[in-house]
From Swiss-Prot:
GO terms for biological process: DNA-templated transcription initiation. Keywords: DNA-binding, Plasmid, Sigma factor, Transcription, Transcription regulation. Pfam families: Sigma70_r1_2, Sigma70_r2, Sigma70_r3, Sigma70_r4. The gene is sigB. NCBIfam families: Sig70-cyanoRpoD (TIGR02997), sigma70-ECF (TIGR02937). A motif (Polymerase core binding) lies at residues 125-138. This is RNA polymerase sigma-B factor. Belongs to the sigma-70 factor family. Residues 294-313 bind DNA. It comes from the Bacteria. It comes from Nostoc sp. (strain PCC 7120 / SAG 25.82 / UTEX 2576). GO terms for molecular function: DNA binding; sigma factor activity. Sigma factors are initiation factors that promote the attachment of RNA polymerase to specific initiation sites and are then released.
Amino acid sequence: MPNSTSQVTKLKSKNNEFSYTADAVSIYLHKIGRVPLLSHEQEIFFAQQVQQMMVMFTAKEELAEKLQREPTLQEWADKMQLKEDVLLQQLSQGQIAKQKMIQANLRLVVSIAKKYQKRNLEFLDLIQEGALGLERGVEKFDPTLGYKFSTYAYWWIRQGITRAIAQQSRTIRLPIHMADKLNKIKCVQRELSQKLGYIAGVTEIAQALNLEPSQIREYLQLVRQPVSLDMRIGFEQDTQLQDLLKDDGMSPERYAERELLYQDIHNLLAKLTPQQKEVLILRFGLAGGCELTLVQISQRMGISRERVRQVEKQALTLLRRYGIDSRSYLAD
């Protein structure tokens, strides 16, 4: 009979864990919700400062490559044709502007992360990866192109989240290009299913993506996740998965019998001539290979089929002289 106290304890533990996660998310959402959105003019102003900072970092990297060492502050300032204090001031302004753009757009990160929940990554982890993508978007954004930053940042945030899912949520990591292909297949499958009114099959997906059905099946095989044999299952969580799986492997007793049999066969074959030994090995697959016909053996050994038959008969007759019934071994 299940232990009710144990069940209650486990349920409380799970509820406490869920409550902690939910509280952390609530606190985070409340915190970022207090940050005001930027106006279009502010986006342009801060983006220009960030771009100026990125130009400085690029110049520093070029200088380091040329000098084959880390440049001094004076060398860096000379490269930018600025005084040291002006260089430091513009770097500081760039960092502040970058943080303002990131903080003002974290709600966009949360909005995108919600679409990727239940992908084997915690919600807060999705947000963190999306924030890293947002940071990259801030560094790359060119305000002179005229579009809103949120439109540009959306792609970077989404890429950060999807790549993290591809790299971290699987026991066996998939290459990025394969993960992207899987996401494309899933997206097309959803669209086709909505359009057709039933779950789209492999052939329909393949036609939509201009691929062969075999390619789609190969990609879909990669979606399968490995499962730990130590995973606990059941209501009480007191049974391991491996305890319920049939072991098709050889038992220790059977393994010992087989090894003794191999040793006996080796001793038997040692009593034969090299030609007789080779014929029996090939004829009965004693070396772990397939059993060959008389014709196949004759072709391999370069002798006639009749000669192979004679050698086989001689070998078996010789073994019987030693009082050994070879059929019991060869049948095994």
